[in-house]
């Protein structure tokens, strides 16, 4: 309706029409601010003489789509030795500890966070970090040296519920519309959600036969809890951690039980057999559930317009 506003403050349930202006048309209305064009959104107004109450609800589901074509030939390690035992990064070093069940299994470079180590071999059993953790259900159990990383294990199905309630009424020389929308979304990333609330009021009336008054008010509330991050931004960008880094032999589902009885976190990227603290990467499920970051934004948008019909069909 002519008021410049943030796109995040727009409630699509209130939109009646959208028009795109380019070039001189946008510049004529908005000056330099319209130099790149303008999107004109007209919101709904009251239309029913008797009064109309409308209620709508939408349910939307979303899921993570994995389109990464990741190599499945080599496991954790940095140099991919071609002969058994010729590099420290190879898996082919026998476990020398005293944990029952692990004798005859191999260890590898747990500290390394890339997957160019020894080639996979289903005949080989290896010691995982969980095999060394006496508080884990995997304690004393070796795993098969094979590809196990599935990024879909990091995510869930996200669901969005949106409810809109509006009331509109129109009589001679007067129309009004009030609407409220509440939207709650659980994200595909565990322990993430978002809230959107929109309140809108729009009225038009003619106090005299030659004057028209239009008033519009919009309130928007937006809260994000653990919104997804992007780029090289530390351990919170979990997807980046397992596409740029990571070990493809790790089965992430084994690490969903991420917390030990003492409160410390289990991770696949330990420093060594004797040091189970994280070398570079924490447990992704711990990052999802133990960090809670909330951001709240609010917008109040007021706009008003008065037009006066003068004699000789002139307007001001």
Model-derived regions, located:
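Residues embedded in well-ordered regular secondary structure
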Residues: 1, 47-191, 229-231, 259-276, ...
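Short acidic/polar hinge/loop motifs at secondary-structure boundaries
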Residues: 1-23
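Transmembrane beta-barrel strand/turn architecture of Gram-negative outer membrane proteins
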Residues: 14-17, 34-67, 76, 83, ...
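Histidine-centered metal-chelating micro-motifs
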Residues: 25-27
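A short glycine-leucine-enriched loop at secondary-structure breakpoints
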Residues: 29-33
């Amino acid at each position: 309706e002519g008021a410049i506003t943030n796109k995040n403050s727009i409630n699509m349930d209130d939109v009646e029409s959208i028009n795109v202006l380019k070039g001189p048309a946008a510049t004529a209305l908005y000056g330099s601010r319209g130099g790149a064009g303008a999107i004109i959104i007209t919101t709904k107004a009251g239309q029913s003489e008797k009064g109309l109450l409308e209620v709508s609800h939408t349910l939307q589901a979303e899921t993570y789509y994995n389109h990464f074509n990741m190599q499945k030939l080599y496991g954790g390690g940095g140099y991919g030795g071609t002969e058994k035992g010729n590099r420290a990064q190879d898996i082919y070093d026998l476990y020398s500890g005293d944990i029952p069940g692990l004798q005859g299994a191999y260890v590898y470079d747990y500290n390394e966070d890339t997957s160019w180590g020894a080639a996979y071999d289903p005949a080989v059993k290896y010691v995982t970090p969980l095999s060394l953790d006496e508080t884990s259900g995997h304690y004393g159990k070796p795993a098969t040296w094979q590809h196990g990383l599935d990024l879909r294990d990091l995510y869930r199905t996200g669901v969005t519920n949106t409810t809109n309630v509006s009331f509109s009424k129109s009589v001679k020389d007067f129309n009004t519309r009030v609407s409220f929308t509440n939207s709650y979304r659980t994200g595909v990333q565990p322990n993430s959600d978002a809230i959107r609330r929109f309140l809108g009021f729009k009225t038009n009336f003619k106090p005299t036969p030659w004057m028209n008054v239009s008033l519009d008010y919009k309130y928007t509330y937006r809260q994000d809890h653990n919104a997804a991050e992007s780029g090289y931004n530390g351990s919170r960008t979990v997807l980046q951690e397992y596409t740029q880094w990571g070990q493809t032999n790790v089965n992430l589902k084994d690490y969903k039980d991420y917390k030990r009885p003492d409160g410390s976190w289990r991770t696949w990227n330990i420093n060594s057999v004797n040091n189970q603290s994280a070398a570079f990467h924490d447990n992704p499920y711990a990052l999802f559930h133990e960090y809670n970051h909330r951001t709240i934004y609010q917008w109040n948008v007021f706009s008003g317009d008065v037009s006066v019909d003068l004699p000789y069909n002139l307007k001001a």
